């Protein structure tokens, strides 16, 4: 024994080597722990330095503002009356005198110009007065006031002769028919006066027969017309109203619509004859009827310039007359209604039938009419009937282009035949109009479908500034209104409801977390501490926090786009590879910010990625309940619900680090590109086995047509060895996530992943329901308490 001790004085025998190795391991472990503590101290020191630098920056800002204020006050002091010497002030007096003289000269020049302008205005006023007094009693004024089209072919003296012939043929008129000249003159004057008060006259005078409500008696209308005529005659010739916008456009329209006005005059005469024959036949065959107006009096009754059955509204004693007219060809096509009751024959209107009425109060409105574009000037006129129809805004005189409406057709038809054509081939513009419009819409929709605009801008920041939130013990109801019935989401923690801040009305989200023990409370506090350090547009922001006996409530930023996979599985959403690039890039930017602050998310999955809007490509990462600060050699057991997004080191309970999150990013990217889960098996055990062995491949059908850059991106993330995976910084520099403009110019590939994603989500929902049913069946087997 002594010999052995002499040869081996240090005691390094076969049994001494393990002891020495154990001591070395203990020493290395102690050094690593010391190193970890130093790293933590450095991190805390870095945070303190950052806070102090922010305070210094704020102090510098305040100092700069104070310096600016001081300079401004000094400048004001130097500019004061006592700042300059008397000698300098005396030297500046001549300049001031020169400036005053120049101002006086300019004032005199402006006065002379104003005087000349005043003289010009007086001369123009006199000229207008002369023109008004000249035209006041002319035939042009009579035609304008009587509502007759002044630019029709023929002599201007034809109008009064036609009126005389109509008056001779009129015979016995009903009580409600008024004198043409007085009522129409008063109506035109009333319409002009209303147009001066407001720009929205109810009626439009189109040079067509006026339609007046039968509920008003003839004596009342005659009295109103007489009062209006007295008001018009009382006007001074110098106060003659200027011509309206439509009247000023009459000469221009006269040269364009000469052909159409001939058709209009023929249609008016034809309508007069039709009404005369119809009323004579009604009075001879049917006699008087209680359900019809009094039209059984003997004698022919032409249409005349005035017909009834329209609404007259009074505004400050001035009647408003709404004018409407439709063309008709034969007596069989006439269908006149009053308050919803037919006059004459009660046949249902068909193609070519005309409804000539103005819907009174309480009557059933007609469907809105299609827009018709006028050829003169490109203006468009839209007619609508019913209580909800708005009055036509514009001048009191509106001309209508009758070339767009063929004879025998009308817009107010029930049961209109879409295949009906105009009897005259030269006037089928209205029949071709809808077809052209539909063709134009198809072309525009095809052009819009060919041009797809993708929004690659950054996600919008939170509607509030980043803040360090401290937990409050007060009731949440004192500051926020939580909508318990409006659930935004849920999970292992609890539910997320929509809420509103009482003081500002800001829309927020309230995450209610149930806690049962001290460990749960510590986890929630850890989540709050981590979110206090996050300030990035792709990460959800914390606004407030409340603690109660059995729960925590985190008030966070609200986004209404829904989960990422809920949106891309929508049938109306078409996913392309460029869309996946935009989504993946923003996910990598958020993860890169987390890793820069030594934070691991450890629960990246599609359910924890929200879209900011329903149409854009902006996303935000949520749920930091499992997030941890990075510490070397830490074993972390994750309580997860869906295993196919976990990294092999998490399944094996090994050390986790930054590449753990990048594995989840690779799985999410694979699913976005293909619609398949790379490791999903029939059971959870099979799924974990695939993850541990890293057994996956690119499906030949789903990845057909995708770029090699996309496959390379996924291949460099789904690697079993942690050190071989790309980091978030390397992902952002990858070729696939860059050069978006070039990719957008040549991106015409549409993915087939949408249907596969729908099938995948349906399968997951089915599995969840199956587990719920299984759990319920197991609970039923437990014996019940007596």
Swiss-Prot record:
Catalytic residue positions: 603
Tissue note: Expressed in cardiomyocytes (at protein level). Up-regulated in heart after experimental myocardial infarction at the mRNA level.
One cellular component term from this protein's GO annotations in UniProt: actin cytoskeleton
Entry keyword DNA repair: no
Pfam families: Pkinase
EC number(s) per entry: 2.7.11.18
GO biological process terms, semicolon-separated: cardiac myofibril assembly; cellular response to interleukin-1; positive regulation of membrane permeability; positive regulation of sarcomere organization; positive regulation of tight junction disassembly; sarcomere organization; sarcomerogenesis; signal transduction
Record carries keyword Secreted: no
Induction record: by NRG1 (at protein level).
First-level EC class: transferase
This protein's name: Myosin light chain kinase 3
Gene that encodes the chain: Mylk3
């Amino acid at each position: 024994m002594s010999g052995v001790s002499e040869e081996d004085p240090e005691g390094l025998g076969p049994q001494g080597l393990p002891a020495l190795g154990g001591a070395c391991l203990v020493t290395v472990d102690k050094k690593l722990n010391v190193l970890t503590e130093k790293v933590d101290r450095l991190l805390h020191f870095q945070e303190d330095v950052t806070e102090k630098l922010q305070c210094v920056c704020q102090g510098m800002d305040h100092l700069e503002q104070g310096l600016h204020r001081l300079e401004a006050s000094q400048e004001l002091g130097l500019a004061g009356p006592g700042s300059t010497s008397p000698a300098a002030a005396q030297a500046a007096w001549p300049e001031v005198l020169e400036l005053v003289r120049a101002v006086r000269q300019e004032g005199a020049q402006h006065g002379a110009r104003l005087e000349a302008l005043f003289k010009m205005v007086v001369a123009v006023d006199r000229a207008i007065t002369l023109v008004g007094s000249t035209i006041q009693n002319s035939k042009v004024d009579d035609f304008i006031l009587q509502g007759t089209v002044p630019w029709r072919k023929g002599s201007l003296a034809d109008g009064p002769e036609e009126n005389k012939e109509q008056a001779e043929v009129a015979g016995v008129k009903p009580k409600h028919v008024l004198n043409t000249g007085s009522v129409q003159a008063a109506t035109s004057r009333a319409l002009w006066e209303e147009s001066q008060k407001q720009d929205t006259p109810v009626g439009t005078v189109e040079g067509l027969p006026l339609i007046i409500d039968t509920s008003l008696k003839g004596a009342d209308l005659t009295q109103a017309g007489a009062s209006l005529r007295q008001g018009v005659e009382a006007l001074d010739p110098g106060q003659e109203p200027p011509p309206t916008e439509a009247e000023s456009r009459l000469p221009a329209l006269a040269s364009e619509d000469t052909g159409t006005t001939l058709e209009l005059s023929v249609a008016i005469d034809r309508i007069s004859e039709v009404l005369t024959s119809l009323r004579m036949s009604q009075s001879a065959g049917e006699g008087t009827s209680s359900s019809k107006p009094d039209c059984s009096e003997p004698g022919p009754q032409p249409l005349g310039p005035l017909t009834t059955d329209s609404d007259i509204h009074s505004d400050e004693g001035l009647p408003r007359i709404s004018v409407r007219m439709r063309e008709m060809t034969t007596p069989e096509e006439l269908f006149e209604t009053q308050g919803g009751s037919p006059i004459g024959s009660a046949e249902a209107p068909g193609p070519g039938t005309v409804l000539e009425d103005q819907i009174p109060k309480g009557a059933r409105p007609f469907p809105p009419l299609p827009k018709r574009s006028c050829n003169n000037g490109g203006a468009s006129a839209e007619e609508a009937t019913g209580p909800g129809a708005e009055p036509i805004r514009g001048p009191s005189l509106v001309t209508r282009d009758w070339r767009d409406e063929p004879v025998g057709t009308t817009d107010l038809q029930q049961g209109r035949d879409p295949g009906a054509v105009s009897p005259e081939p030269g006037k089928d513009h209205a029949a071709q109009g809808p077809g052209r419009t539909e063709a134009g819409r198809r072309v525009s929709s095809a052009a819009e479908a060919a041009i797809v605009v993708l929004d690659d801008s950054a996600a919008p920041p939170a509607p509030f500034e980043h803040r360090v939130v401290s937990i409050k013990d007060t009731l949440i109801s004192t500051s926020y209104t939580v909508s318990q019935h409006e659930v935004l989401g849920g999970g292992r923690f609890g539910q997320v409801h929509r809420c509103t801040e009482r003081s500002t009305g800001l829309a927020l989200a309230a995450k209610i977390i149930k806690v049962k023990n001290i460990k749960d409370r510590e986890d929630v506090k850890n989540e709050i501490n981590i979110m206090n350090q996050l300030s990035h547009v792709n990460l959800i922001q914390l606004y407030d926090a409340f603690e109660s006996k059995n729960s925590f409530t985190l008030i966070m930023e609200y986004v209404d786009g829904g989960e990422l996979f809920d949106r891309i599985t929508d049938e109306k959403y078409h996913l392309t590879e460029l869309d996946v690039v935009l989504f993946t890039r923003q996910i990598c930017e958020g993860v890169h910010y987390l890793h820069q602050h030594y934070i691991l998310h450890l629960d990246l999955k599609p359910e924890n990625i929200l879209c900011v809007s329903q149409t854009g490509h902006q996303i935000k990462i949520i749920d930091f309940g499992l997030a941890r600060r990075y510490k070397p050699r830490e074993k972390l057991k994750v309580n997860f619900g869906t295993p196919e997004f976990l990294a092999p080191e998490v399944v094996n309970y090994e050390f986790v680090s930054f590449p753990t999150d990048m594995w989840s990013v690779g799985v999410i990217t694979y699913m976005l590109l293909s619609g398949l889960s790379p490791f999903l098996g029939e059971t959870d055990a099979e799924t974990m086995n695939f993850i541990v062995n890293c057994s996956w491949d690119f499906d030949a059908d789903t990845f057909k047509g995708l770029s090699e850059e996309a496959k390379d991106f996924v291949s460099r993330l789904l690697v079993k060895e942690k050190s071989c995976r790309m980091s978030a910084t390397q992902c952002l520099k990858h070729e696939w996530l860059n050069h978006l403009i070039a990719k957008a110019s040549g991106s015409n590939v549409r993915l087939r992943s949408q249907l596969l994603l729908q099938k995948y989500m349906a399968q997951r929902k089915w599995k969840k329901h199956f587990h719920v049913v299984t759990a319920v069946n197991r609970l039923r087997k437990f014996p019940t308490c007596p």
